[in-house]
Amino acid sequence: MNKSIKILDCTFRDGGYYNNWDFESHLVNKYLHAINNANIDIIELGFRNFPQDKFLGAFAYTTDTYIDELNISSDISVAVMIDAKSILNSSFSVEEAISLLFQEKEKSRVDLVRIATHFDSVEKCKEIVYVLKKLGYQICLNLMQSNGKPNDELSKIAKLIQGWEVVDVLYFADSLGNMDNDDVVRIISALKSDWTGLIGFHAHNNKGLAVSNTLIAIENGVSWVDSTILGMGRGAGNAQTENLLLELEQQYQLNYRVNALFDLVLSEFTPLQQHYHWGEGLLYSLSAMNNIHPSYIQEMLTDNRYSNKEVLQAVDFMSSIDASHYNKDLLLAAHGGSTNKGSWNAKDWCLNKEV
């Protein structure tokens, strides 16, 4: 058991997929107070992103100006996440793009930047990593959709990143929620063959194994693990911070105070869960088994236009193709190319009527 673990709570970042990263100020203040009292090591507040063409809340951007307004204890490290493709696909050079999003570390409350990337974009992330490191930030590289990758591909990627000599923590993510304990052990072993630094793990709960997989990861040498309050996160959600801390306190007597989270869980996040309905269930289990991106399930479950039959038909359709990446057009195709339409027609509506 690695007792030098770090708990990274990413409630606002991952949970924001349900409310467009728009959390009420009273909840934010209560969360920050409880997280500090629970001795959580790191909070990932949200994404750092360019302006979007639709409304998104403060934690979709997590600007330094906004962070400075928050009452964050100096004992807690602060992280933000960037999606590598938002940098790589921008109209700017990598250095220009990052300069628009980040200032030097000494001027920012942010300590750590996590870069989320798919395996086929890892090599392109090298410049992003170097530019951010030069600004003074700790760097995590987050390998998305790690399950199903063969050992030789995992080792090759680990060796490549090891050669950069600037990444502080190499994360692997169960993005589709389809890992079991054996998958976690296999991936860690493959990464360790060519990576000598710290390893982190980000679990999803499609199969109800998020906490179990996280504990297995810790037992096998992972030192950074992610969680969210009540598991709030995209699709089925994540390992629940409170449940994970209960296990760690009971098994290893680590220095966390889980009771500091109880009121936050019951008073604030339980009503949110009842409203947004994240959590494990049949459809998320089916999506995990068939490598379907969880956003498809979340989209259908939160849209009352889709009947249960239509959702199951869409899952069946997506099970026969590559649906591991979210694409709105694919969701439409799964429903026959269009969403449900009403039958009302305006023709002759005003015929022989006074208007």
Cite the ranges covered by each PLM segment.
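Catalytic cores and adjacent flexible loops of soluble metabolic enzymes
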Residues: 1-355
